[in-house]
């Protein structure tokens, strides 16, 4: 149990990439926690937004791999925000504080929904250059819990954890998926009552994405064919909403492919970001491009051969 937590990679990550804490709101209790790794000269980095159960370090495998290729990557953990507008306003202030005009966003589950809402919120003065949406959704009504959204704040932590764990895979899983679930359960345990209640509120509060406001943003939809908390209907809805999106399908990986299928996820992220190389919105150090592009081409060739 807990293989990932004691792995050399995770411990090296925790030992070398500092966790920063930043306050951008008038309320001092609203603290953003983040890992910012890779070349600071990059002004349009890739930012990772976690699911309900996740902390910033659930993306450590993306941070290690992508910074090794010359990308600047930031992984975040949200403060306690109770509605989407409050989140979007806080996130905008955070980007201002970090002096980032535009960013690429990778959002997992709730993180993907919030990424879309932020793109929508800033559509008149765009801050989002592209989106990677992993196991994500565009309408909170799919969870059939909009009626309970206003009562999460009253529930004790153990009850909230039970709600979240109910969405974790309960069927047979391979060892890597089992390790990923163990790690996410451990991360879930580290979250306090207000953190969990606020995230569940954001996840279930009645809201949907207005696609006409963000239709010009390049999107990659990343989803898992096997078991995941998302219904087929929710996935189909995403395809309809973004008809021009690139699709990155993983055969297996459950709810947390960034942990248990990290090589595939990292490759799809690189393929998505390739389209911005050579522009001012590149997330990579220009001197690293040629070597990195060759590797991506080799990797994508391998994936397409496997699928045939």
From Swiss-Prot:
Localisation: Cytoplasm
Residues of the AB hydrolase-1 domain: 87-159
Family stated for the protein in its record: Belongs to the AB hydrolase superfamily.
Modified residues (Phosphoserine): 304
Alphabetical list of InterPro entries matching this protein: AB_hydrolase_1 (IPR000073), AB_hydrolase_fold (IPR029058), Maspardin (IPR026151)
PANTHER family assigned: ACID CLUSTER PROTEIN 33 (PTHR15913), MASPARDIN (PTHR15913:SF0)
Any one GO molecular-function label of the UniProt entry: CD4 receptor binding
Any one annotated GO CC term: cytosol
Keywords tagged on the record: Cytoplasm, Phosphoprotein
Record text on subunit structure and interactions: Interacts with CD4. Interacts with ALDH16A1.
SUPFAM superfamilies: alpha/beta-Hydrolases
Task of the protein: May play a role as a negative regulatory factor in CD4-dependent T-cell activation.
Name assigned to this protein: Maspardin
Source domain of life: Eukaryota
Higher taxonomy: Eukaryota, Metazoa, Chordata, Craniata, Vertebrata
């Amino acid at each position: 149990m807990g293989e990932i937590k004691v792995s050399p990679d995770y411990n090296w990550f925790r030992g070398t990439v500092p966790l920063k804490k930043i306050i951008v709101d008038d309320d001092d209790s609203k603290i953003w926690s983040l890992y910012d790794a890779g070349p600071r000269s990059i002004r349009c980095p890739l930012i990772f937004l976690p699911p309900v159960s996740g902390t910033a370090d659930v993306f450590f495998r993306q941070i290690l791999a992508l910074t090794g290729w010359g990308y600047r990557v930031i992984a975040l953990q949200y403060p306690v925000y109770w509605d989407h507008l409050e989140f979007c306003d806080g996130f905008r202030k955070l980007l201002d504080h970090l002096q980032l005009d535009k960013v690429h966003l990778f959002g997992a589950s709730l993180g993907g929904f919030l990424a879309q809402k932020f793109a929508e919120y800033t559509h008149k003065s765009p801050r989002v250059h592209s989106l990677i949406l992993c196991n994500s959704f565009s309408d909170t009504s799919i969870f059939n819990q909009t009626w309970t959204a206003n009562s999460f704040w009253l529930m004790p932590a153990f009850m909230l954890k039970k709600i979240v764990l109910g969405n974790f895979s309960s069927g047979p899983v391979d060892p890597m998926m089992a390790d990923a679930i163990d790690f996410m359960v451990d991360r879930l345990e580290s979250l306090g009552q207000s953190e969990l209640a606020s995230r569940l509120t954001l996840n279930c509060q009645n809201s949907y994405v207005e696609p006409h406001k963000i239709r010009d943003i390049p999107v990659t939809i990343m989803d898992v064919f096997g078991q995941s908390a998302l219904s087929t209907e929710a996935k189909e809805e995403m395809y309809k909403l973004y008809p021009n999106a690139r699709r990155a399908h993983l055969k297996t990986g459950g709810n947390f492919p960034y942990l248990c299928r990290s090589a595939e996820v990292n490759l799809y992220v690189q393929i998505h970001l390739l389209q911005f190389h050579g522009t001012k919105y590149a997330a990579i150090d220009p001197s690293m491009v040629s070597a990195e592009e060759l590797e991506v081409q080799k990797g994508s060739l391998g994936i397409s051969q496997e699928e045939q």
